[in-house]
Amino acid sequence: QKLCERPSGTWSGVCGNNNACKN
């Protein structure tokens, strides 16, 4: 799984099958 990038520029959570960010 790869990290998700938030609009603020920080990385948090993981990307699911639909690239959805889960905190």
Curated annotation (Swiss-Prot):
One of the GO BP terms on file: defense response to fungus
Residues the record lists as Pyrrolidone carboxylic acid modifications: Q1
Keyword presence, Lyase: no
Top-level taxon: Eukaryota
Keywords attached to this entry: Antimicrobial, Fungicide, Plant defense, Pyrrolidone carboxylic acid
TM segment ranges: none
Gene3D superfamilies on file: Knottin, scorpion toxin-like
Any one Pfam family match given in the protein's UniProt record, by short name: Gamma-thionin
Subunit: Forms oligomers in its native state.
Function: Possesses antifungal activity sensitive to inorganic cations.
Similarity comment: Belongs to the DEFL family.
Protein name: Defensin-like protein 2
UniProt organism field: Brassica napus
